[in-house]
C-alpha cells in the first residue's frame, strides 16, 4: 500500500536529509597533533594591589586548569604593594604552566613591584622602549622607620629577589642591584 507522507512528515524528512548532507560536507576535525596550543593572556596595566593580584592569580589558575601551553603576563605597572607582589610571584613560581612576563607596549614600565614580577617569570621579555628597575623598598607615606628596620626590609627584599633570580638562571647581581640601589 502506497501512502502519501503528510506535510509534517515530509518536512521532517527534508530536515533530516538536509542535516545529513550538512554533516557529510563539514570539514573533519583536525588530528590532535594539529590542535593549536592555548596561551592565556593576562594584562597587568595597573598598580600592584589586591584587586590586580586576584585578577592575575585567577588568570594563572585558569591556565593551569585548561592545561594551557603558557601564560603571557603583559606588564605595565609603576609597582605597588609588597604583599600583593609576593602573592603574584608565588602564583607565577608555583604554576605548572610556564609564565612569560612581558613588559609592553612601548613606553611601559615594570618598576618596583613590577620588577619582581618580571624577573619571576619563566621567560622575562621587554618590548623596545620599556624600562624596569627601581625596586628599592619604600614605605607608604614616606614614614621614617629608622636605619635598622630599613636595612632589614632591604635585605629581605634582596634575598627574595635573589631566590627566584637564581631559580630562573638570571643575573643575580643585577637583580639585587635593582633592589639595593636607590637611584
Specify the residue positions occupied by each region the protein language model found.
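Soluble extramembrane regions of membrane proteins in the secretory/endomembrane system
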Residues: 21-183
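Bacterial N-terminal signal peptides
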Residues: 11-22
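Bacterial N-terminal signal peptides that target proteins for export
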Residues: 1-12
Amino acid at each position: 500500500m502506497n501512502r502519501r507522507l503528510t506535510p509534517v512528515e515530509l518536512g521532517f524528512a527534508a530536515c533530516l536529509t538536509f542535516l545529513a548532507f550538512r554533516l557529510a560536507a563539514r570539514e573533519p576535525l583536525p588530528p590532535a597533533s594539529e590542535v593549536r596550543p592555548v596561551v592565556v593572556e593576562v594584562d597587568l596595566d595597573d598598580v600592584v594591589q589586591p584587586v590586580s593580584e586576584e585578577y592575575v592569580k585567577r588568570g594563572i589558575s585558569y591556565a593551569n586548569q585548561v592545561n594551557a601551553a603558557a601564560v603571557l603576563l603583559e606588564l605595565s605597572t609603576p609597582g605597588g604593594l609588597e604583599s600583593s607582589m609576593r602573592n603574584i610571584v608565588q602564583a607565577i613560581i608555583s604554576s605548572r604552566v610556564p609564565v612569560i612576563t612581558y613588559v609592553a607596549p612601548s613606553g611601559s614600565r615594570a618598576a618596583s613591584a613590577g620588577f619582581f614580577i618580571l624577573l619571576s617569570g619563566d621567560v622575562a621579555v621587554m618590548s623596545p622602549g620599556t624600562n624596569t628597575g627601581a625596586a628599592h623598598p619604600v614605605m607608604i607615606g614616606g614614614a621614617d622607620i629608622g636605619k635598622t628596620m630599613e636595612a632589614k626590609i632591604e635585605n629581605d627584599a634582596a634575598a627574595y629577589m635573589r631566590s627566584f633570580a637564581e631559580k630562573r638562571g638570571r643575573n643575580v647581581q643585577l637583580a639585587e642591584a635593582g633592589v639595593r640601589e636607590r637611584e
